[in-house]
Amino acid sequence: MSSQNSFMSSKKDDKGKNIQVVVRCRPFNQLERKASSHSVLECDAPRKEVCVRTGGINDKLGKKTYTFDMVFGPAAKQIDVYRSVVCPILDEVIMGYNCTVFAYGQTGTGKTFTMEGERSADEEFTWEQDPLAGIIPRTLHQIFEKLSENGTEFSVKVSLLEIYNEELFDLLSPSPDVGERLQMFDDPRNKRGVIIKGLEEVSVHNKDEVYHILERGAARRKTASTLMNAYSSRSHSVFSVTIHMKETTVDGEELVKIGKLNLVDLAGSENIGRSGAVDKRAREAGNINQSLLTLGRVITALVERAPHIPYRESKLTRILQDSLGGRTKTSIIATVSPASINLEETVSTLEYANRAKNIMNKPEVNQKLTKRALIKEYTEEIERLKRDLATAREKNGVYLSNENYEQLQGKVLSQEEIITEYTEKITAMEEEIKRINELFAENKKELEECTTILQCKEKELEETQKNLHESKEQLAQEAFVVTALETTEKKLHGTANKLLTTVRETSKDVSGLHAKLDRKRAVDQHNTQVHENFAEQMDKRFSVIERSVDEYSVKQQGMLDFYTNSIDNLLGASSAALSVTATAVAKSFTSVQETVSEKVSHSVDEILKQETLSSQAKDDLQKLMAAHRTGLEQALRTDLLPVVTAVLNLNSHLSHCLQNFQAVADKIDSHKEEMNSFFTEHSRSLHRLRLDSGSALSSIQSEYESLKVEIETAQSMHSEGVNNLIGSLQNQLNLLAMETQQNFSGFLAKGGKLQKSVGCLQQDLDSISSDAIEHTSSHHDKFAGQSQDIAVEIRQLAASNMGTLEESSKQCEKLTGSINAISRESQHWCESASQQIDSLLEEQVCYLRTSKKHLQSLQKDVEVGCGASVVEITEHVNAQRQAEEKALTSLVEQVRDDKEMLGEQRLELHEQVQSGQNKVNSYLNEELRNDVPTGTTPQRRDYVYPSLLVRTKPRDVLLEQFRQQQQEYLESISSVISEAVEPPVEQDSLEDEPPVAVNDSVMSEKSCIDLSMVCQENGGVPFFQQKKALRKEKENRANTTLLERSKIMDEAEQSLPKSKLPLRMQN
């Protein structure tokens, strides 16, 4: 039981795993920049947060923050999204999981670009280097790379499904009919899966075929241009990748592992008002929004754990049923826009993605199939389809009652379940042994690796200690050099302070001088420039004004004189023109009167001609009607009589057909005899089939015996392998061997039962074959009787056709009589038409006569009207001439008044120009600036500053001095320690101090270097030289107390840190 539980746990890992949700924000596009839209989205990739400003620009409180599994900002690249989202999923697909990745978001936010991308101009890019490639081409490229590196046999098949207006279409179908709709059915092997009938799966052999497949699908996919996106996807697409991989177990058995990856590119949700969709585009948008709303309801129901999930309300949710709450690992990429004009859609997308995080899936690894089982399954399926096809073609087969068929199917299903159960148990045990062996090998390998790493680390530690010793020596030398450099730096710092003080004083004086010069220069330049520019501009302006005023006055005077002369001339010319106009009008009316009289007489002549032509047309029409009647009679004789003859010929032809029917009946009788012989031969073949099936079942019995022997052999080999391979796990293996023994015994018992069931099946097959022979004989007798009935019916049909022919002859005679009647009726019609035409012609002649009288009366009216019009025009022209003379006289008076007014304006303008010149002179004389002394100009003086700089000694000299000081210090320390140890020390003076044990071997190289680094600031002398001087002074004094010696020992002890490493000196 423990092995079975471990197998089930390894098969169903990652129970209750949440859907992974990723948010990607695209950059601003040109449409959003033209609309002056600002950003309302802040993406924090390290913290995996997205912040949305729902208020105004200055509203700091109106923010909403969402947390997701991953967040990609506008600067994120295609490869970053792929490596973070799809690479881990791809490894799980190769392990045998079903995985789904789909992109959701508003239209125009980059879903298709994320899933498919674009193809770069240089086709030599790999999937990692191509900057524009999307998830689909990168996925297939990496699948081929990974599987090729593993060295396993594999096959990759892809399919591309489109959901457009709630209809399914295959974008990779080889048929030219793009509009062929597909049907969807529930998968009986997977309760949450579906099967698409007729969906084409294309085999992909290398990564170079990926772009060709995508181009085929993109060429058929429905796209259109809207106001929000130039290439808006109008449908959902599902790109499925199925991988079959072959594995070889320890026993040499070949297994087939299946992994599936669904890459879904959803159509974007859109606002019809903003996208400008109408008619067909509006219906598409409605269907898209409807399917996305259903998807949202499904997600809400899954999060709230509702009892009913509305998967079947949309074909999109029905296809994604296993990806939402099923056994598939799912990732959602939500694409959003950062622009403020898309704030509502962005918030809706983020809310949708935030709800989808809480969906729980239960991923399961697809069951591995053995190669033999898979081939056997395919072979049985092919044979079954062949038998069904042959039966359908020949309309032949084995027929059973429903009870026997259901009983047989129940037995087969129960036996298949028993065999499947024991096969799974054996597979679980084999996998458990394989896992234990792999674990042992991995632990052994890890132990060897750890041993190797430990040896390497020990070598590295020795090298590090050696490098540490050298580094400490170099550090001590550098510290001594730095001390000397600090001393020199302090001296240089004092010199620099003095120089900076002098520089500040000189800079202050120079600034004062420059300020003085700038003030002088500014005043001079300002006055000169203002004076010159203002004087020049004002002189030019006043000269131009004065000249223009003079010219304007002269011109106005000339214009007034010209107006006066022109008006006088206009009055004379107008009077003459009016007189001429009156005379011309009178002449024109006279000519009009003559013309009208002439035209009326001409019209009378035309009417007379029309009467003559009408009479002639009447005669011609009567002749035409007579010719029509003659032609119609001739057509009836020449055309219809042959038709009647043809009908009679058809009657004779039908008689010949009846004779043919009689011959067919004779042939059917011969066919009946042939069928008798066929059914006899068929009965013999069924008998042979029964004998062949008996021999086949006997061979199955022998194969079962051999299989039984092989199972017993495998059992003995398994026991020996378990005893020899693992000794440390003896107790567990004993339990495993007992369980295996019990399972094998049960398997042998079931095999015995299977043998009995095969015997029963053989007996059933014999009985079924006998029934089939009897059934075939009964069908033979039935078919012979039916053939005889058919022959009798054909003879009866021939007799009925003879009656039909006689009736058709009678109808032909009736047709001849009706044709003669039609001829008489057409003659009568021609006579009546001739009478109607005569009456119409007479009416036309009467109408022309009345028109003649009307034109004569019109001529008289025109003559009277023209005379009256001439009188009126003459009176009107005279009145017009008097009005113009009066208006021109008043105009001359007005022009004289304007001339006097212009003279007055000229005098006023001269006065204004004179006053302007006076103002300019006062400005130039009174308003110019002068330079005023400020008293801040510096006086001349001398500056004192240092002229020499201190320089540090060379590095070689400093290092030599350091070595000498170190040597002297070590000698002084040795002497001090020796003097402190030689004389006896009183116990009372050392009670308060800890015991000191000094040994050269206990000192570390660090302590030595630290002693050599401590120096005083006065001249760079180290403190150990001062101790040496104290030691010499102590030696010269004879009465040195024990307290002073103890103080020296304390100083030495404090300056020497304790260490367990030996002291190494290299001078």
UniProtKB/Swiss-Prot annotation:
This is Kinesin-like protein KIF11. The modification Phosphoserine is found at S1046. InterPro entries: KIF11-like, KIF11-like_kin_motor_dom, Kinesin-assoc_MT-bd_dom, Kinesin_motor_CS, Kinesin_motor_dom, Kinesin_motor_dom_sf, P-loop_NTPase. Keywords: ATP-binding, Cell cycle, Cell division, Coiled coil, Cytoplasm, Cytoskeleton, Microtubule, Mitosis, Motor protein, Nucleotide-binding, Phosphoprotein. It comes from Xenopus tropicalis. The keyword Coiled coil applies. The modification Phosphothreonine is found at T937. The gene is kif11. It is found in: Cytoplasm; Cytoplasm, Cytoskeleton, Spindle pole. GO terms for cellular component: centrosome; cytoplasm; spindle microtubule; spindle pole. ATP binds at G105, Q106, T107, G108, T109, G110, K111, T112.
